[in-house]
Amino acid sequence: MATRQPPSTTARPTARLYLVTPALADPQAAADLLGPALAAADVAAVLLRLAPADERTLINRIKEIAPPVQARGAALLIDGHAGLAARAGADGAHLTGIAAVQEALRSLKPERIVGAGGLASRHDAMLAAESGADYVMFGEPDPAGQRPSFEAIRERVEWWAEVFEIPCVAYAASLAEIGELVAAEFIALSPSIVSDPRGPAAAVADAAARLSAESLA
């Protein structure tokens, strides 16, 4: 079983931000998006989604995008493409489904981060953690764009955060969801948030302010 933790009498630390990009094909577009976002607030990690391309092109994109992200103190994780993460200098990969997670663990651990998403059940989440995943994510949309009800997502996040030591990432589809997900160690800001018409800096600053307000409530 995944490691369970005893009940805590201390306040839970404020959740940190985890940015999810839209599918990017151009390193300059990534810089234009991530540079202002990472300067606006403390960000723990960036989940980089890449537009389809051949392997060499993908590696070159990651190699260009990784250093500025890492220089800001954020981990760069690649969505899928576990085999490219180490070769391109990323900090790890985020995989969807327990089978993909377990395969990535064999090739990336212990040097790199392996995150687990697309977990259909509590059992899958516990299995991912037991297998060695560094975090589990709840609430992200499936390939068809569907996600569980928000109430179910919040319940799953609160259950996990209360019981297990492995961190969880709660996926916020909108800024309004952030305040309801603060039990998680990390809040993932969806591509629609990061691509806010006000600009990435304003969106990330807004998200950080909401987290700060919840921590003081």
Question: Residues of each region from the PLM?
Answer:
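Glycine-rich, proline-tolerant flexible connector loops at the mouths of alpha/beta enzymes
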Residues: A45-T57, E140-R147
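Short secondary-structure boundary segments
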Residues: A23, L50, G97, G118-L119, ...
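Conserved beta-strand positions in the central sheet of alpha/beta enzyme cores
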Residues: A45-L47, L77, H94, M137, ...
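Active-site mouth loops of central-metabolism enzymes
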Residues: P13-A31, I113-A120, A170-A172
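Glycine-rich phosphate-binding active-site loops on the catalytic face of alpha/beta enzymes
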Residues: L19, G97-A104, Y135-P148, E180-R210
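Histidine/lysine/aspartate-rich catalytic loop segments that bind and position anionic ligands
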Residues: G115-P148
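Catalytic cores of alpha/beta
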Residues: L76-D91, A120-G132, V163, P167-L189
